[in-house]
Amino acid sequence: MDIRKAYLDFFASKGHEITPSSPLVPDDATLLFANAGMVPFKSIFTGEIPRPNPPRKTSCQTCIRAGGKHNDLDNVGYTARHHTFFEMLGNFSFGDYFKEQAIAYAWEFVTEVLKLPKDRLYVTVHENDDEAFNLWQKHIQKERIYKFGDKDNFWQMGDTGPCGPCSEIFYDQGEEHFNSSEDYMGGDGDRFLEIWNLVFMQYERSADGVLSPLPKPSIDTGMGLERVTAIKEGKFSNFDSSLFMPIINEISKLCNKTYIYESGASFRVIADHIRSSVFLLAQGVSFDKEGRGYVLRRILRRALRHGYLLGFKQAFMYKLVDIVCDLMGGHYTYLNEKKDFIKEQIRLEEERFLSTIENGIEIFNEELKNTKEIFSGEVAFKLYDTYGFPLDLTADMLREKNLKVDEEKFELLMNEQKARAKASWKGSGDKTASGDFKNLLEKFGENHFVGYEKAECESKILALLDEDFKEVSTLKDAGWVMLENTPFYATSGGQSADSGFIAKREVLDTQKFFNLNLSFVKAGEELKVGDIVHARIDTEKREQIARHHSATHLLHHALREILGSHVSQAGSLVESNKLRFDFTHHKALNKEELESIEKRVNEMIINSSEAILENMPLEEAKKSGAIALFNEKYQGNVRVLTLGESKELCGGTHVKNTAQIGSFYIVKESGVSAGVRRIEAVVSKAALEFVKNQLEELSKVKDELKNNDILNGVKKLKNEILSLKNELKNSSKTELDSKNIQGVEICVKRIDNGDIKAMIDDFKNKFAKAVILLIQVKDEKITLAAGVKDAPLKAGALVKEAAQILGGNGGGRDDFATAGGKDLSKINEALKQSLETIEKAL
């Protein structure tokens, strides 16, 4: 049974509009990831945006709980129902139906669609919610309805705002399968399993804690797909269901080990974590050192450590991407489009970590011998800083030994590192708007953007705010103006804001707060609320912004055409004199690729394609082939821009014909983070300025070379430099002192100049048997290298021992190895220890 489809179809038949899952990265600064079904509708529940039409929605929302307030990462694999990635089925009413219909719908779906036995179902309500208690008695015996307090049956979004009692449906998995003393309704056992939560949002909680009835109460429900699938299939663990077992079977095949539930935590961790990794990468999150990208890295590295326990010593996670796409690509079709890109990203990240995991585990095990209860915070930090072990990975390894890590010491060292990194940084931070925009929204509604059609207009001033966002009736100083109709485009979707004039006041910026367009003006003549003023934009700036914005669409199309369909927008900045476009791709672009992209964009410009703008429902737009961005929030009808072969959802300002863009030049290509590249480019007047500057630079080079043939002049210079380098290399060879032990020539020394590898090679060539270790310091950076020739030592082990004394690490072949170090104060100690090691071996 396709429960996901059955659920959505059921509520569609009850007048609910099916809403596609919103991005895992929400348009909400308070959330790391979408972690519940109601996240896309939060602004509706809080009144920030008007109620939709129809006021009933249903969805299957993809969710991540790994990091932030809601973090299930540590429990995944060890319990039957915790996941980092899951799907939440939900139905929502925004001031439409309330408790009676919500309860009736839930009961009908559970008993008639899912066909769960009624004698296995129980219900809970809030102890003071007599209305829900009485309504439930129409469907289920009174004895099966339990009352609980705020802890279990009251839901609120935050300390203030919409809230209300909730009612939960439980499923009895059978007394015969469970024997815990907690296996009763309200207990912590696993026998009675909550499958659906119905939230009755009927109150508004004020800052002083007072509950006031909402004029139009709402419904928010959530049912975990993984949990209800396991119940429907008669499984006691989500991991035993058809959503996970194909992945677990594939892991079993790859490692040639049989999966047994009781000892299969590592299988379950990997099966869960590959799902979250695939979805996060598909939606534009990339591996990084901070933020969401670091959560993704933590998830994958935790899975790799469990893979190590199963015997995987080489990259393997990327081989599981196919089975995830097979299982879920039918509903989430974008997975198939990004499959190859996802596999490559995971493989590269695996190889990054696998190169250090063995050394890290070795250090972990050594410290474990000295640990009784608390694992050293210093060693945990070293594992993080040097070997890439996230703290929760170390904690997970310790959990298996019933030990804990000294998190306080770890955080102290982490903060010290951050302080050092920021020692030279000074700044005041962002000023936070403190105005009550919600009141303005309730008073006036959204003001109207007329800038698509008009560059100037007469408009009424609805509100004025000072620089601290406090409402004022008159304004002479700098501040914010809210016009009834505004031609000024607010910063949005990467496009920078318009500038211009309101009356005689210069507009420097326009921003959107709670869907209100507010323009920031310089100090000047007095403005009053209610004034009718003339507003006009800087049309020259608008046109240049439009040219650069349209060019980003052509660039996006060219990237997908030349590099592959895995490319998606990961960020953009559009200004009047440049554009910046971030996109998903696993490696730097070569010269040929950049030339092809630049050429393709210019071809599309020359084709003189008319811009076609259409408004249509989101689903219709997607079916037409329009590209939607994962990090954008779309509601109701969307605006679709077609420029030749490019077709995207976009709310920005654009040219009427691609020919207006002029010419397109790529200025720079660079990396932003793992799996994300950036192209900076210019068009129109900025492109002409760029070419002019390039020609001027070439002219200066020609003058410096005193040669009209620039290319040959540069080649001649390069040959001269190479010749001088060789002379310097030969002149800098240092005569190395050595001594002979048992017929083996030994040299252990610090050097300041010369090519360290060349010196080791020269030393080994002079003698039949040789052992040499050199430490070189340049710009406070320590480099170690060792060489062995026909002697009972290994260069890799020798250099590793010395590097660890210096706070670094390294290795290599038995005959030659290199390493790096950090602690300059311990160089003599490292040299002494290395000499002792060599002498003992001989």
UniProtKB/Swiss-Prot annotation:
Q: Which Gene3D superfamilies match?
A: 2.40.30.130, 3.10.310.40, 3.30.54.20, Bira Bifunctional Protein, Domain 2, Threonyl-trna Synthetase, Chain A, domain 2
Kindly indicate whether the keyword Protein biosynthesis belongs to this entry: yes
Q: Where does the UniProt annotation locate this protein? A: Cytoplasm
- Cofactor(s) the protein needs: Zn(2+)
Q: What keywords sit in the KW lines?
A: Aminoacyl-tRNA synthetase, ATP-binding, Cytoplasm, Ligase, Metal-binding, Nucleotide-binding, Protein biosynthesis, RNA-binding, tRNA-binding, Zinc
| Record PROSITE patterns | AA_TRNA_LIGASE_II_ALA
Task: Kindly give the CDD domains that the UniProt entry links to this protein.
Answer: AlaRS_core
Q: Name one GO cellular component term.
A: cytosol
Domain of life (superkingdom): Bacteria
Name the major location.
cytoplasm
**What EC class does the entry list?**
ligase
GO BP annotations of the record are: alanyl-tRNA aminoacylation; negative regulation of DNA-templated transcription
Cofactor descriptive note: Binds 1 zinc ion per subunit.
Q: Which GO terms describe its molecular function?
A: alanine-tRNA ligase activity; aminoacyl-tRNA deacylase activity; ATP binding; tRNA binding; zinc ion binding
Q: What is its EC number?
A: 6.1.1.7
Q: Which InterPro entries match?
A: aa-tRNA-synth_II/BPL/LPL, Ala-tRNA-lgiase_IIc, Ala-tRNA-ligase_IIc_anticod-bd, Ala-tRNA-synth_IIc_core, Ala-tRNA-synth_IIc_N, Ala-tRNA_ligase, Ala_tRNA_ligase_euk/bac, DHHA1_dom
Reaction catalyzed: tRNA(Ala) + L-alanine + ATP = L-alanyl-tRNA(Ala) + AMP + diphosphate
Where, in this chain's numbering, is Zn(2+) bound? 549, 553, 650, 654
What HAMAP family does this protein map onto? Answer: Ala_tRNA_synth_B
- Domain comment text? Consists of three domains; the N-terminal catalytic domain, the editing domain and the C-terminal C-Ala domain. The editing domain removes incorrectly charged amino acids, while the C-Ala domain, along with tRNA(Ala), serves as a bridge to cooperatively bring together the editing and aminoacylation centers thus stimulating deacylation of misacylated tRNAs.
Q: Which purpose does this protein serve, as stated in its record?
A: Catalyzes the attachment of alanine to tRNA(Ala) in a two-step reaction: alanine is first activated by ATP to form Ala-AMP and then transferred to the acceptor end of tRNA(Ala). Also edits incorrectly charged Ser-tRNA(Ala) and Gly-tRNA(Ala) via its editing domain.
Please state which protein family the record places this protein in.
Belongs to the class-II aminoacyl-tRNA synthetase family.
Protein name per Swiss-Prot or TrEMBL: Alanine--tRNA ligase
Per the UniProt record, the source organism is Campylobacter jejuni subsp. jejuni serotype O:23/36 (strain 81-176)
